[in-house]
Amino acid sequence: DFPDVRQKCLISSAKEGNILVLPREGGYVFRMYVELDKLRPDEKAAHRKFTQDDMIAAANRIIKPYTLDVKEVVWWSIYDIGHSITDKFDDVPEGEDRNPRVFTAGDACHTHSPKAGQGMNVSMQDTFNLGWKLIQVLQGRANPSLLRSYSKERLTEAKRLVETDHKWSRVMSAPTTQAERDGTEEPRIIRQFKDNLEFTGGTAVKYDTSYLFAASAHQALATGE
């Protein structure tokens, strides 16, 4: 009976955690990311043997005084939020000077929470960056050394992704403050969303100056534009 279940929203309780609600197809299906019990640093979710009923019970504690009467669970899973990043996106060892022959992209390079769809966004950016360079080299339009730029460019963005997601995860799992609940202070999740709007929208990608990218010293609009 939660009135906004068909709207994307974050439900924050004072003590029981948070739920992220994402409406899906059909007019009645929706996805819920439910925060479960806190784990010890040396503990994994698999050790606790959580069940579907545990998730539903946690959701009802968080959503109270509203209730969640589950008719059918299409799919469910338990996961730990793990932030990790690869050392490089190709097979060139540190200190070796040659063109790469093997490349990795997407989740093989960076892992994080599933919030905000960043895994898909950044993975597509990885493969687009690599794809156009491979085409140019294979068609003889560019020197194979062009492929060296892939790892450097995407590693920088992957680090930004993991750092941003770590902040997101901490904010979303933190209990709400009294000031947030009584409306005298803007919720931290709203501030985080505003601060990272361009990044989560995929429009904040910025590569360092190289032979592919000029410096931004002359990028301002001309007078009158």
Description of each model-found segment:
Residues 40-49, 65, 90-102, 181:
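Intrinsically disordered, low-complexity coil segments
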Residues 15-20, 26, 37-41, 98-111, ...:
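Short, surface-exposed, charge-dense and proline/glycine-enriched linear segments
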Residues 5-8, 13-14, 24-25, 82-84, ...:
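Surface-exposed loop/turn and secondary-structure junction residues enriched for glycine/proline
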